A protein has these predicted regions:
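Forkhead-associated
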Residues: 1-67
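Regulatory inter-domain linker segments that are low-complexity and enriched
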Residues: 65-79
Length: 79
């Protein structure tokens, strides 16, 4: 899932500090990672600048002038 200020981003945020496609979150069904997409201003996770890093529930992602909290919400699949 890509995040940025461009309409082509999966999640579009009106923040001039964000690149058109700033970062993406990758989820494999068990584990998640955040990857900076060569943004101009960089992406930080829990206060550390990253290129790519594994993330867990309640991880703070900062990009541009925006803060994001990654949440994992379990859901029950009924049969």
């Amino acid at each position: 899932t890509s995040v940025g200020r461009d309409a082509s981003a999966d999640i579009q945020i009106d923040d001039n500090g964000l690149s058109r496609k700033h970062f993406e979150i990758v989820w494999d069904g068990k584990n998640a990672a955040v990857r900076d997409l060569r943004s101009t201003n960089g992406t930080t996770v829990n206060g550390k600048k990253i290129d790519e890093v594994a993330i867990a529930d309640n991880t703070l992602i900062q990009a541009g002038r925006s803060d994001f909290t990654f949440r994992v919400i379990a859901r029950t699949i009924s049969e």
